[in-house]
UniProtKB/Swiss-Prot annotation:
Protein residues bound to ATP: G65, P66, E67, S68, S69, G70, K71, T72
GO molecular function annotation: ATP binding; ATP hydrolysis activity; ATP-dependent DNA damage sensor activity; damaged DNA binding; single-stranded DNA binding
Domain of life: Bacteria
Native organism: Staphylococcus carnosus (strain TM300)
Annotated protein name in UniProt: Protein RecA
Length: 355
């Protein structure tokens, strides 16, 4: 580029920085954080399927699927992982159905989980926006989009029609939220249900409530479905669950993670370590027997799960070797010094006031 054009460009950039603040325009190569940072999902199998070691920071994630498929369980595991790393988590319980006993069993620190049970959709999304713009929250979960009922619908009569109200609400909210989520480096997880379109003869009749905006704004979309029941004798103790990455802007999509979700316990970390360990030649399987480093751990998967629970050091060793081989690591919450945190808070507050 010749000198005259470069001078003109430099002048324009200086003017833009005066108007909109430093960093409003930059060269892509000047950005230090080129690799997408992430937070662990709490499952090694899912972290591997997501391609970047977990849910990307500063992005929107949608988790959807049929009833009782494990959507909330998957989201709660991510909250537990964030809290283990010293991060802050918030949960917008629009369904008014969060079970604190179950959440605690999954490893969630319920004493330090910020919970809101909004009266209507607008209130829930405004609370979510305030949390995001504070710059102090690392993950926020909205459960669920389908339960974010517009205020007009709640205050109206039963049987009144409100065409497209929820879709417009979500579209407006996501337009406001997307920029703030990126700047605050917060991961926003929206849980969604599925509905069936009427009169669809060909193709998939299933769709998700809340319009199309969430599909567009999401960097990652996960479809959670039960594959089969897990039994001990005649008793059903859990479900084999398939989690398909149907959209991924940060890694190749359409990968599938299969996990065991046990009733009252959540994702069986021992189960996925066994499965992945065998696949990656870290755990040896001969018939029904499983061995690690030449030592037999047990016969049958359930016995090996119990063995790993009783020997946490072996479980951790297998986990470390798997993450090293697959190139995935626990997402770390970046520690910010007080000045940086205060600057971000002021910036986000100013943005909030302007809008």
């Amino acid at each position: 580029m010749d000198n005259e054009r470069q001078k003109a460009l430099d002048t324009v950039i200086k003017n833009m920085e005066k108007s909109f603040g430093k960093g409003a325009v930059m060269k892509l190569g000047d950005n230090k954080a080129r690799r997408v940072s992430s937070i662990s999902s709490g499952s090694v199998t899912l972290d591997n399927a997501l391609g970047v070691g977990g849910y990307p920071k500063g992005r929107i994630v949608e988790i959807y699927g049929p009833e009782s498929s494990g959507k909330t369980t998957v989201a709660l595991h991510a909250i537990a992982e964030v809290q283990k790393q010293g991060g802050v988590a918030a949960f917008i319980d629009a369904e008014h159905a969060l079970d604190p006993v179950y959440a605690e069993a999954l490893g969630v620190d319920i004493d330090n989980l910020y919970l809101s049970q909004p009266d209507h959709g607008e209130q829930g999304l405004e609370i979510a926006e305030a949390f995001v713009r504070s710059g102090a929250v690392d993950i926020i979960v909205v459960d669920s989009v389908a339960a974010l009922t517009p205020k007009a619908e709640i205050e109206g009569e039963m049987g009144d029609t409100h065409v497209g109200l929820q879709a417009r609400l979500m579209s407006q909210a996501l337009r406001k939220l997307s920029g703030a989520i990126s700047k605050s480096n917060c991961t926003a997880v929206f849980i969604n249900q599925i509905r069936e379109k009427v009169g669809v003869m060909f193709g998939n009749p299933e769709t998700t409530p809340g319009g199309r905006a969430l599909k567009f704004y999401s960097s990652v979309r996960l479809e959670v479905r039960r594959a089969e029941q897990l039994k001990q004798g005649q008793e059903i103790v859990g479900n084999r669950t398939k989690i398909k990455v149907v959209k991924n802007k940060v890694a190749p999509p359409f990968r599938v993670a299969e996990v065991d979700i046990m009733y009252g316990q959540g994702i069986s970390k021992e189960g996925e370590l066994i499965d992945l360990g065998v696949e990656n030649d870290i755990v040896d399987k001969s018939g029904a027997w499983y061995s690690y480093n030449g030592d037999r751990m047990g016969q049958g998967k359930e016995n090996v799960k119990n063995y790993l629970k009783e020997h946490p050091e072996i479980k951790q060793d297998i986990d470390n070797k798997l993450r090293q081989k697959l190139g995935i690591f626990d997402g770390d919450i970046e520690e910010k010094d007080e000045k940086q945190a205060e600057a971000e808070k002021n910036e986000n507050t100013n943005l909030f006031d302007e809008e």
